[in-house]
Amino acid sequence: MRYQPLSRRLINLIYPLVIYMAIGMAVLGLYPNGGLMANLIEKVSCIIIMGILFYKDSKQIRWEGKKLSLYSAIIMIIIGICACIGVNMLFELTGLKTIREEDAKNVAKALYSDKLWLQILVVGIAAPVAEELLFRGILYRRMRTWLSVGPSALAALLIFAAVHGNLLQALYAFILGAHLIW
């Protein structure tokens, strides 16, 4: 990718986030009580748009990353599951879970009050794919064109955590995002 001034680089980082949030606000405006179905519409819309941006970036940014073998992917999934359990246990032991218990209850109510297949589709597939495309597929890769691995990863993690809204989700997103970006 050719040299770009700092202002252009920042715009290239900000506009995918703005699009992501605008889609969320538009869907919320159209379906204020839409629950997980509205969330599914939002995430699928994000996957399509972020997929287009990712595809365009793939043509411009030469990615030097290693290919992930099936064995490594399975190991990473197992480590991710263990990390989820570990983070939950850590939050329980330290009392962090009670910091914003009302927020946690509201999130749980919104996520787990619909049909199981819809929960799996939204929470287990659509949301992670949309977030991975945006935060690691677009933002992290764009930052890697002008920053080293460490600062790029840290910046992407901080943005990923901040977008999750409340302290508990931000901490959780930061810790698990660090596993994914590693």
Task: Identify the role of each PLM range.
Residues 30-45, 114-119, 148-156:
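Membrane-interface starts of transmembrane alpha-helices
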